[in-house]
Amino acid sequence: MVDFKSIIAKVATGATLTRDEATDAFDAMMSGDATPSQMGALLMGLRVRGETVDEITGAVTTMRAKMLPVTAPPDAVDIVGTGGDGSGSVNVSTCASFVVAGCGVTVAKHGNRALSSKSGAADVLAALGVKIDITPEQVGRCVNEAGIGFMFAPTHHPAMKNVGPTRVELATRTIFNLLGPLSNPAGVKRQMIGVFSRQWVQPLAQVLKNLGSEAVWVVHGSDGLDEITLSGTTAVAELKNGEITSFEISPEDAGLPRAPADALKGGDAQANAVALRAVLEGMPGPYRDVALLNAAATLVVAGKARDLKEGVALGTQSIDSGAAEARLKKLIAVSAAA
């Protein structure tokens, strides 16, 4: 068993942990073998110094080893944001997930209830009528029959109960805010991940490369959004063919108009559910455009579109044909029957 005191002592000097040390330390925390004080000390020590790629890789390795998995096709994708961007925006990645699923790409979405906003992925899906507290086997059925499934993080990461109270007491961002999107229970190898700070764009792409992902976009909007934004440029780190490339994109690259950040302000889960359903029913406007933009990037990651403009064309067809809305209705039905 890891000597947790020596781990804390090492971090206290400003030294970094090896990948194996991080794996062992997080195993101790998630197994209930570390006290709340020890966990708080380590989490804040890492936060103040800044977590390294090796430390995040080790922590994710433990998260993945302890999660309850879901069976999904090898070409399934996930669209997810870390949350915590403080924007209070509408549920962009959730809406984009249905657009992508309507294009025939299987989506295995991993998410939770809101952290800093009024409505996280789980909140808005529940408001839409999707049953979220179902077993991993039932989620697998949704993925296979509806082409989209939602994995509610607390169900799939039961070991997190050992660190939950400490996280609540700390009441500030820790490494765990980064780990969720990296710990998809379906083991997807293709992801579009939004992060709350530009500093994490490149490192998280490197972590996913370390862990064997095939195709990834990690993004952060210039307005602070943990999605691809309409209001300005978006920083991207792309993992493709084993190489990481960094670049910036704008709405114009996808043939979409810009819109101010406040045009995407959301409300509570019920209000956001109404707005999401309106997009899937064909309502034009900034919410539709940002959903198309993020769906387009995901279709590029999935290998379904060559570029953002083709992705937007496919996404537009998904919405206007009713295919995206049909995926939502099918998910509601299959999850209810679970």
Swiss-Prot record:
Any Pfam family matching the protein: Glycos_transf_3
Keywords, alphabetical: Amino-acid biosynthesis, Aromatic amino acid biosynthesis, Glycosyltransferase, Magnesium, Metal-binding, Transferase, Tryptophan biosynthesis
Residues the record lists as binding anthranilate 2: R167
Catalytic activity line of the entry: N-(5-phospho-beta-D-ribosyl)anthranilate + diphosphate = 5-phospho-alpha-D-ribose 1-diphosphate + anthranilate
Gene Ontology biological-process entries: L-tryptophan biosynthetic process
Binding-site positions, anthranilate 1: G81, N112
Amino acids binding 5-phospho-alpha-D-ribose 1-diphosphate: 81, 84-85, 89, 91-94, 109-117, 121
A GO term for molecular function: anthranilate phosphoribosyltransferase activity
Enzyme class, first EC level, given as a word: transferase
Keyword Transit peptide listed: no
Domain of life of the native organism: Bacteria
EC number per UniProt: 2.4.2.18
GO CC annotations on file: cytosol
Described purpose of this protein according to its UniProt entry: Catalyzes the transfer of the phosphoribosyl group of 5-phosphorylribose-1-pyrophosphate (PRPP) to anthranilate to yield N-(5'-phosphoribosyl)-anthranilate (PRA).
Subunit structure: Homodimer.
Protein name from the UniProt record: Anthranilate phosphoribosyltransferase
The species this protein was found in: Rhodopseudomonas palustris (strain TIE-1)
